[in-house]
From Swiss-Prot:
<dbReference type="InterPro" id="IPR028989">
    <property type="entry name" value="RimP_N"/>
</dbReference>
<keyword id="KW-0963">Cytoplasm</keyword>
<dbReference type="InterPro" id="IPR003728">
    <property type="entry name" value="Ribosome_maturation_RimP"/>
</dbReference>
<dbReference type="InterPro" id="IPR028998">
    <property type="entry name" value="RimP_C"/>
</dbReference>
<protein>
    <recommendedName>
        <fullName>Ribosome maturation factor RimP</fullName>
    </recommendedName>
</protein>
<dbReference type="GO" id="GO:0005829">
    <property type="term" value="C:cytosol"/>
</dbReference>
<comment type="function">
    <text>Required for maturation of 30S ribosomal subunits.</text>
</comment>
<comment type="similarity">
    <text>Belongs to the RimP family.</text>
</comment>
<dbReference type="Pfam" id="PF02576">
    <property type="entry name" value="RimP_N"/>
</dbReference>
<dbReference type="GO" id="GO:0000028">
    <property type="term" value="P:ribosomal small subunit assembly"/>
</dbReference>
<dbReference type="GO" id="GO:0006412">
    <property type="term" value="P:translation"/>
</dbReference>
<dbReference type="InterPro" id="IPR036847">
    <property type="entry name" value="RimP_C_sf"/>
</dbReference>
<dbReference type="InterPro" id="IPR035956">
    <property type="entry name" value="RimP_N_sf"/>
</dbReference>
<keyword id="KW-0690">Ribosome biogenesis</keyword>
<dbReference type="Pfam" id="PF17384">
    <property type="entry name" value="DUF150_C"/>
</dbReference>
Length: 153
């Protein structure tokens, strides 16, 4: 199990107890600094004070459990307009929206695709309408995905 998935399982109960959805979390390096980025949301959106409240709750859990070796910075925020997509339910929620995905392994010589989410089946296969074709990808083959903000309507 990846460290991000372990962290997700560890902090989800604390986030949900406050009435928020834990959209996802990512652990990465920015220069010499390790960052734990946590995305939370609720219907109607989430504000700065709520992010601070969630941050304090997550910090308390992480201080007790100590799952990350060494120093790191905790960042808690809303997922934003170009929100990350992690689960089949995230894709289902945003059917009809544009997304960009990066695959773990290349397909037809490329790893990155942009298209409209048109379906997610029961086997968790995501279907994207690309410019000139349909792309069907099992969720497990997607390394990273985000919505694309559409300001043109």
């Amino acid at each position: 199990m990846s460290q991000a998935r372990t962290l997700h399982r560890l902090i989800a109960p604390a986030v949900e107890a406050l009435g928020f959805e834990l959209v996802g979390c990512e652990l990465f390096r920015r220069g010499a600094t390790r960052i734990l980025q946590v995305f939370v949301d609720k219907p109607g959106g989430i504000g700065l004070d709520e992010c601070a409240k969630v941050s304090r709750q997550i910090s308390a859990v992480l201080d007790v459990e100590d799952p990350i070796r060494g120093r790191y910075t905790l960042e808690v925020s809303s997922p934003g307009l170009e929100r990350p997509l992690y689960t089949a339910n995230h894709y289902r929620r945003f059917i009809g929206n544009k997304a960009k995905i990066r695959l773990r392994e290349p397909r037809e010589g490329q790893r990155q695709f942009r298209g409209m989410i048109v379906a997610v089946d029961n086997e968790e296969q995501v279907t994207l309408q690309l410019d000139n074709k349909i792309l069907k990808v099992p969720l497990g083959e997607i390394e990273k995905a985000n919505l694309i903000a559409d300001f043109e309507g």
